[in-house]
Amino acid sequence: FASVEVGWRSMLYLTVTGRNDWASQLAYSKNSSFFYPSVGLSAVVSNMVNMPEWFTFLKVRGSYSKVASAFARYLSNPAYSFNNQTHNWSKPSTYPAYNLKPEDTKSWEIGLNARFLNHINLDVTYYRSNTYHQTIYAPLPSSSGYNQVVVQAGDVQNQGVELALGYNNKWNDFTWSSSYTFTLNRNEIKRLAAGEVNPVTGETITDNEIQKDWLGASNVAPQVILRPGGSMSDIYVNHELKRDLNGNIEIDPSTGNLSIAETDFRKVGQLSPRYTMGWSNSFGYKGIELGAVLTARIGGLTYSATQGVLDYYGASQATADARDRGGIPINYGTVDPQKYYSAISTAEGGYGAYYLYSATNVRLQELSLQYTLPARWFRNKARLTVGFVAKNLWMIYCKAPFDPEISAATDNAYYQGVDYFMQPSTRNFGFNVKLQF
């Protein structure tokens, strides 16, 4: 690793870095190492030209970087797996992949830092990155002795904006510090493996989608499907209540039952938020400091398999309310709640089209109050601060039946904000004492 930084007259700064890594995953590749550089240039405009008196500082910057990372182990040298229950060894199902390349991410960004009116500071960044050589699995015929082979392809682009706006001021003994942050990211799949050549069969790959995990315990849940032009978190559903030619939900006239039809996959949204925001404030007066942090996640969907299971067994608040109302309004009448919920839910979860919720939420993330005792009490030789802090204190707005920010910590198959009988989010309270000499 090497890094060089050059400055000129406190106006221009150039930074160049280079790094070379050797990875054991590349043991059977032509190149057993990979190099990735970066370069950044910044200019302090306020030191180069005369600025208005109220504009105290302005710096613009730009950078380009390439980051490489090795793929998962055993792709180039698959290992046999041992079953602790049957005490049998099984051969790998993935064809050994040779001459693999590291996954590359090429990115650039531009931004500025500004301070003006003596109290306001602004930091804005725009970035774009593309990731290549991703690991994609292509199917193999059973005659090969394997199920799949690794193909390195794809192009996934991320671009977005990060903004931070701050304000600091003091009036005699009263101080106020405020900070607002805004982040926006747009993710797009530019290309998958279609058009690449299968290294084993020599055939051109035509599949142009990748079906990822179901967002629950069974295939009644929504599914994440990757397609060119979409994002890495697009949600699709393929089960809905049967409808007639006029679009009305079909109800069996003799039994009053409803039924689910399997349909083509239909995109209904994505897991990722449209943007996120945060606003923190700190107020101080004669040793007393009050702080508050508000956060907001806007957009995106979330799925609750828990709600589906509770509805199926008639144990949810929704089923109780439906019984009290005398039924579920459908078409021009009502349907028995038991028949409705037994149609759209199962013992393992709910059909995705009916158990997706907006992940938008606004909360009071943190509230703190602290007091610093007068230094004269300690003969000006020490400072003692006592404080109280509460986190995740108040969910101001949330339409989902659970906290959309929770995530499973033990199973990678579930995404953040997907609920399958997970532990509820917690509200924390703390007390702290800080002594400084």
Tell me what each language-model feature is.
Residues 95-97, 101, 127-171, 242, ...:
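Outer membrane beta-barrel strand-and-loop segments of large Gram-negative receptors
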Residues 151, 170-271, 399-401:
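Conserved small-residue
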Residues 1, 77, 81-122, 149-171, ...:
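Outer-membrane beta-barrel signature, preferentially recognizing the C-terminal barrel domain
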Residues 1-27, 32-47, 57-100, 105-108, 118-122, 128-153, 190-193, 408, ...:
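Surface-exposed extracellular loop regions of Gram-negative outer-membrane beta-barrel proteins
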Residues 23, 297-385, 389-391:
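Extracytoplasmic gating/loop element in the C-terminal half of outer-membrane beta-barrel translocons
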